[in-house]
Amino acid sequence: MQIQQPPPEVARVGLRGIKMLATADGEFHTLERGLMDAAQKHILGTQFELDDLESITPRELADGIPQPLREQISNGCLITALIDGEASSAERLLLDEYAEAFGIKSPELTNLHRLVDNHLLLFRLDVARRSFLGQRVKKFVAERGLRGISHLIQGLRKAENQEVADRYRGLGDCAEGTLGRSYLDFTRKNGFSVPGEIGGPPEPVVFHDCLHVLAGYETSPLEETQIASFQAGLMKKQPMFGMFFMLAQFQLGIQVTPIAGAEFMQVDPDLMLKALVRGTQVNRDLTSDWDPWDDFEKPVIELRRAYNILPR
């Protein structure tokens, strides 16, 4: 995901538009305030008093935001609409007006419509398909064909695949401090199974646990919101669906993945944006074209340096 720091005068215009969206349902929620403060802290580098921001029309907003920044402001509005745990009809209407003024048509906005209209099956399917999870599964099946599909089905049926399980258990032979050894230690410490074991995740999800290790996030719901935001930050293809995935799973209570149950109102806006920006600084999209097996024998500290994974 590319995030730009606009000039202060442009940032103020954008914040006015976001505040209009936040208050469209008649309430300026604490989480919406927190999100706007976090955006100023981690992205904009400004300190505007939110209560002093004037109202603005969609046309005025579009006139004040140059083309390269319109998608970024639109994404900020989408996150704002969801951060309080629900999307309202009033927010949807204003988002439609913003999109028309910006000249933007996006699948993200289509999915916000699905949320408001309670078309949750379509929402789940599309977010899962476009998020890092869907991209990973698609790549896994494309590379392994019918055998890959068979492995996925076997895992969902809670059946053991000893060949796959033994391969991952063998990572215990890697040197201490390597990604392979650290990944296996991470799974065992948290009571997880490895792929191939009963209850283990499908192989396309292994990268996620490896990113937990590389980025230093734990597994509580609050920590999961941060690793998911971090992942969205380093995604090059449809990164906003990484944020949609996280917000649905941990803020809206809508289960998108069959691997873990949904949580409600777990997001801290400041920590979320801090993790998102941290992800944008990584120099490779580790959610799509990275195979952890290429790096399992390398030291974690070396990989953090190679991929520019900065300290928390």
Residue ranges and their predicted role:
Residues 1-166, 263-269:
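Small-residue-enriched hydrophobic alpha-helices in membranes
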Residues 43, 80, 144, 279-283, ...:
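Short, flexible helical or helix-coil boundary motifs
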Residues 1, 47, 300-312:
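Domain-length accessory/inserted modules outside core catalytic folds
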Residues 41-64, 188-204, 208, 312:
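Generic structural signal for short, solvent-exposed loop/turn connectors between secondary structure elements
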Residues 147-301:
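Core of folded catalytic or high-affinity ligand/protein-binding domains
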Residues 33-34, 40, 52, 77, ...:
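Generic alpha-helix signal with a bias toward terminal, lower-confidence helices
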